[in-house]
Amino acid sequence: MEELNQWKHELSRRRARRKIDSFYPDSGPLRRELYPKHLEFFRAGAQHRERLFLAANRIGKSEGVGAYETALHLTGQYPNWWQGRRFTCGISAWAAGKDSKTTREILQLKLLGNIGDFGTGMIPGDSILHTSPKPGVPEAIESVVVRHIAGNKSRLVFKSYDQGRESFQGTEQHIVWLDEECTRDIYIECLTRTMTTNGLMLMTFTPLLGMTDIVRDFLGITPNEL
């Protein structure tokens, strides 16, 4: 009996460190056919560099869309049904939120898991090679090195809008995931970082600020049409 309990505990532990495998299954109450908008967003990545998942609160934007796709690209562990963009080797990526606190409590949590239990988020535990703490922000991570199935490594850096546009200058990126709406100047700066790599821009947010320039651009609405 003790051996059986140990086996069950180990199985549970391994499943917790492969959270990504539980999303969008073929069948069951959470089968992927129930999420047509999510799948449409993923497919669009094969043709479009810039995408926005604009939706209400509490429908899985951050975890089921942003964190899920970002983790796939970082690891190269695409499911068989994936019809979106694929990267065949390690990448450089940013994930950014409104401020350091929300970045830690949302993006870091969704991708890595709880403090002291990294590997229980969307990035599989055995794919996380190294994490670097963020100076001056308790329990926050600045960067993560991730194993890619091609045999090399990906690197993810957590950033926040309150660092200002200048902090988004410099290095080229393959993926930039912006969770919550940023200012237009930050968006343009991030888009510039992906140009030489033909990289992807992902945005996930609820339009709490109304019909902003960014929302209008994605919806194809001109100011005269408002």
Outline where the language-model segments fall.
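Phosphate/NTP-binding elements of NTP-utilizing enzymes
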Residues: 1-226
